[in-house]
Amino acid sequence: LKSMELNEKNYIRFQGTKSLKDYYKEENGNAVFDKSLLANVSFRKHDLVMGEVFNKFDLILCRNVMIYFNQTLQNEVLKKFHESLFRYGYLAIGSKESLIWCDYASRFIVVNNEEKVYKKIKD
């Protein structure tokens, strides 16, 4: 539950509409989140380099991965992310990463530059 204090601060910082405590209950000293929160969430293991686009998503989280790729490979991965997002979907990348140099940069707007969150605005 100690880590939930930091999560609560982040939740408030990003202007959550309720209290974070509304989404979980304490059981045996642990925070157990309401299972309904995961009803529309899918976690996938995916090869960013060799894998093909396999679905459309509202949100893609890919933090601190692309810093290990050269610029050409980063651009290929961002192309796949672009193709995988619904219009107005969100992409969150690592704090040291950027879309500035990307061929697809004009198809996204910055939602939060500090946290590197982008919104797809063009197909």
Please give the residue ranges for each predicted region.
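ABC-family nucleotide-binding domains
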Residues: 70
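Short secondary-structure junctions
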Residues: 105-111
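Extended basic-aromatic, gly/pro-enriched interface segments that bind polyanionic ligands
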Residues: 1-59, 65, 73, 99, ...
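Conserved beta-strand signature within the Rossmann-like core of class I S-adenosyl-L-methionine
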Residues: 87-95
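A short glycine-rich, Lys/Arg-flanked "PGG" loop and its adjoining helix->strand segment in the class I
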Residues: 75-87
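Short hydrophobic/aromatic beta-strand or adjacent loop that forms the aromatic wall/cage
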Residues: 112-117
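Flexible, glycine-/basic-rich loop-and-beta segments that form/coincide
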Residues: 123
